[in-house]
């Protein structure tokens, strides 16, 4: 918690976040940003920031969920591959997947994805979404520009110029909301699955 809401309340587990110990709250939340930081050292070292006690089996399981195992298995040194400063020797999509794996190792109760699959292809993103769907006890907040990233969510919130515009499921919004319809038709009908058609 970096700052408090100016209106209303933010609740976790039905309880105002201001009632939680800050460190306990931060331990319960995992966040993956669009641009994450990887440290100099091995991939293993980087992943263990999520869980210092993780075994190799744990690391590989998280990498499978994040679809990082596919490119890791092609690296001669696997988990012991040295990363350049800031992860300069892996692609943007590979970096995002490693950061997702690292966050999954934390076993958070609340998982926040802030455009964190923007650099991966839609097939890989679909696999990651499928893996996340198996985390039934985890609350997932996904901030995204791709319709495909959020269309299976229990609830979708549309912000327009920083204000709450509409709330509903994919089917509800597609039936009644013009902004959602515009984004959908721009991305899906126009073949723009990467979300570049409409930005709000």
PLM ranges: what are they?
Residues 111-114:
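Catalytic Walker B motif of ABC-type/P-loop ATPase nucleotide-binding domains
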Residues 133-144, 150:
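Conserved catalytic loops of ABC-family nucleotide-binding domains
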Residues 74-76, 130, 151-200:
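C-terminal portion of ABC ATPase nucleotide-binding domains
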